[in-house]
A protein has these predicted regions:
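Catalytic His-Asp segment of secreted/periplasmic serine-dependent ester chemistry enzymes
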Residues: 285, 292-293, 297, 327, ...
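N-terminal secretory targeting modules
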Residues: 37-46, 53-234, 240-248, 265-270, ...
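Conserved SGNH/GDSL esterase-like catalytic core that processes O-acyl groups on lipids
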Residues: 68, 85, 90-91, 114, ...
Length: 473
């Protein structure tokens, strides 16, 4: 089969992707299913783009892009449900990219009664429960200061002008009149949030705090405007950052976001127009829903549309999921490598149908964890071998290789083990974030998208990374 795709670039436009036949020639995992397009207007400029989609988009225009997000994992059991009575919650979130306008997304997805938000504000956070003077912005919903979310429904605020820096803290304050149960909640925030004394303190410079919580109730996304795109990190507790130090933003997606803002590409540019939205949920699974009340969320199969497709500006996603499926399998409910591979293929197909590149991450070691067994380790190794094969994912992130003990590959490197033999510590999460190849995420309009320099591999945007040419035989 011969595949040839000459393409012209209009001024100020970049080509992202559309389905193309897979090349029949062998390829390496690092190549994924990338294609090379030739720029027109008489120029032979080679663009190395992520996987197999091609449609024109004007990346010079502003658009909404997720800068922060969380996957709701409720509802909790009634006895464990947090309640708020005529109180203000001030929720702290850490941005990945910046912008000049901002909006929030709320959710009553798991509620059984209407959720009334009496008032909502957003501001830059100074420290603790205090906000930066002059940055407080009241939020409206369809022009109204309050909003009522029916059971199962989300709500998107109207946009407001606010200069939001990258890698900064925002404070989202929600006034909850009456008595409200936090049924839609992200239970493992690894971030201190604040609950006020009774009253509406959404605009207060310093919140009069009654108690603190380590969860994010009702808030699921913060978006900013910019000529940017988003990466969704989809996974379980290891993506969620379980056992990282609270209030330090040491989850591996946080480290990826820092690198995108600060690490220069081979030509000296920054890949800093990519937001990172963390959709990890502790205890989450690929194939099945965990026990009710565990706050472990619906399966990846069930929540994919909500947590990936509905994310503003999503263009890429990483997928690290399956260790809880393996660990919780039993003789009565076995989970095989083939079961997980079939689930991965579903996620890949659904993402590709919407033009989203999918990068598979290997499963990290778990020997010594409570649900470990030698038989389950065989399944993990088989899954990782399939992921590394590069046959179906658009690229591979080898977290297993980065975190395992070379002298005992079934275990975490001791320096990276949080102590439960399942989750990394802060150093382990940093190593994972630093191990993500930035060349997987092509800068939008950056110098990475350029003609080959002398000595570069033909068709490659990064020295030393071999990519397929524009014609296959």
């Amino acid at each position: 089969m011969k595949l040839s795709l000459p393409a012209l670039l209009d001024a100020g436009r970049r080509y992202t992707m559309a389905w193309l036949p897979r090349p029949s020639r062998p390829r390496t995992p690092r190549e994924g299913r990338r294609i090379v397009l030739l720029a027109g207007l008489g120029l032979a400029t080679a663009l190395a783009l992520p996987p197999p989609f091609v449609h024109a988009q004007d990346w010079s225009a502003e658009r909404w892009v997720g800068t922060w997000g969380a996957g709701p994992g409720g509802p909790p059991l009634p006895a464990n449900t947090q309640t708020f009575t005529d109180q203000t919650v001030r929720l702290v979130v850490h941005t990945s990219i910046g912008g000049t306008r901002v909006r929030i997304r709320l959710s009553n997805e798991m509620g059984t009664t209407p959720l009334r938000i009496g008032a909502a504000h957003i501001a830059l956070r100074a420290s603790g429960a205090d906000i930066v003077a002059g940055t407080d912005r009241p939020l409206t919903f369809g022009g109204n200061a309050s909003v009522t979310l029916p059971p199962g429904a989300p709500a998107l605020s109207d946009p407001v002008d606010l200069n939001v820096p990258a890698l900064s803290d925002l404070a989202v304050s929600l006034y909850l009149p009456g008595t409200v149960g936090a049924t839609t909640i992200h239970g493992t925030a690894s971030q201190t949030n604040y609950v006020s004394l009774p009253g509406d303190f959404t605009g207060a410079a310093s919140l009069p705090t009654q108690r603190t919580i380590l969860s994010w109730p009702f808030l699921t996304e913060v978006d900013v405007t910019g000529n940017a795109a988003a990466i969704v990190a989809l996974g379980d507790s290891i993506t969620d950052g379980t056992r990282s130090t609270p209030d330090t933003n040491n989850r591996w997606p946080d480290w990826l976001a820092r690198r995108l803002q600060t690490v220069r590409d081979p030509a000296g540019g920054l890949n800093n127009r990519l937001g990172v939205v963390n959709r990890g949920i502790s205890g989450n699974r690929l194939l099945s829903n965990p026990a009710e009340g565990s706050l472990a969320g619906r399966s990846i199969q069930e929540r994919f549309d909500r947590d990936v497709l509905a994310t503003a500006g999503v263009r890429y996603m990483t997928l690290m999921i399956g260790i809880n499926d393996i660990g919780n399998s039993s003789a009565a409910n076995p989970v095989s490598a083939n079961d997980l591979i079939a689930g991965y293929r579903q996620v890949i197909a659904r993402a590709h149908a919407k033009g989203i590149a999918v990068y598979g991450a290997t499963l990290t070691p778990f020997e010594g964890a409570g649900y470990y067994s030698a038989e389950k380790e065989v399944v993990r190794q088989a899954v990782n071998a399939w992921i590394r094969s590069g046959d179906e994912f658009d690229g591979v992130i080898d977290f297993d290789r980065v975190t395992r003990d070379p002298s005992h590959p079934g275990r975490f490197l001791p320096a990276y083990d949080s102590g439960d033999h399942l989750h990394p510590n802060d150093l382990g999460y940093q190593a994972m974030g630093n191990a993500v190849p930035l060349e997987l995420f092509r800068s939008i309009g950056s110098s990475w998208l350029k003609a080959d320099a002398p000595g570069q591999n033909a068709g490659s945007a990064v020295p030393g990374i071999s990519m397929p040419a524009a014609s296959y035989k």
